[in-house]
């Protein structure tokens, strides 16, 4: 770790978090806009739209381990720069797909390749940034590093989605695609001059061994992620079924509460311990989801969404502190990558599984199941992490 003062460390962490925000805008900008392009301009089916969206998630999930090994062997800074290259390349392929627009399936296939590159870039940037930040600040500030990165990523997703829609409405796909190309270049300028760590050569650690080290906090991440995935996938459908207004405000209030708690409580995991904060957070998340399930009106459901955001906010940094505490520094990047994949699993499989259940139990009961998972997660995290 470099010899940095507290002040210079904060400035450096702010710079790499700002770069993370710019990099994650490349993910937020196409988030809502791209499905509309595939539907309205390419006139393709919902199945192909779903593949276009899901291909990025699959690429991220499958490359978490590779990104972690890259961070452990080449350093966090180089891993981030590699991820930026992939993200910029995805924007170039979005532009190329415009040329193939007269042949919709060809244009779609080019977009899929771009989405895969974007998923790889996301994996490398997130894992590299966390590894790099912890090397700069020290493992005792792991919670703060993860919290600042989380604010950057969720802020970019919250801003990027409406920004992408606005740009698409004004100029079609070209302007959002061009911005996706330029943003990683701007982010590279933000991190220019920050020292990077060059790890010493280490033997490669089997992924299964790493899984054995991180499955306890990973289990908590899965049970927490079910709640967020349920809220993001089914709130609009449930509000529509109830004929409630202000559907979009659920995610807005969730995001505001999420970022506010991250901002004001970023040091809680380092101060009070990851296991304690994670257990309390899951209890709050479960309460919020239960409020949504029992809500008699849209207003009550929106309050539940905000409470859920408060509960979800510190889960990633608090469990991340536990991961850092349980693994040796030389495999920290791999461990963070493998552990993050647990969240990808929750986000990827909750929607399809819940979608199979909704014809039988309805949208409302899905929130009850999600609340039960969060409360179960509180008990599991308390037992597994406290006893280990």
UniProtKB/Swiss-Prot annotation:
Main location group: membrane
Q: Which Gene3D superfamilies does the protein's record reference?
A: MFS general substrate transporter like domains
Task: List, alphabetically, the Pfam families matched.
Answer: MFS_1
Q: Which GO terms describe its molecular function?
A: transmembrane transporter activity
What InterPro entries would the database entry show? MFS, MFS_dom, MFS_trans_sf, MFS_Transporters, MFS_YfcJ
Q: Does the keyword Cell inner membrane apply?
A: yes
Where does this one sit in the cell? Cell inner membrane
Q: Which domain of life is it from?
A: Bacteria
Keywords in alphabetical order: Cell inner membrane, Cell membrane, Membrane, Transmembrane, Transmembrane helix, Transport
Q: Which CDD domains match?
A: MFS_YfcJ_like
Q: How does it sit in the membrane?
A: Multi-pass membrane protein
A GO cellular component annotated for this chain's UniProt record is: plasma membrane
Chain ranges passing through the membrane: 18-38, 42-62, 89-111, 116-136, 145-165, 171-191, 219-239, 248-268, 287-307, 341-361, 365-385
Similarity comment text for this entry: Belongs to the major facilitator superfamily. YfcJ family.
Protein's name according to its UniProt entry? Uncharacterized MFS-type transporter STM4428
Q: What is the lineage of its organism?
A: Bacteria, Pseudomonadati, Pseudomonadota, Gammaproteobacteria, Enterobacterales
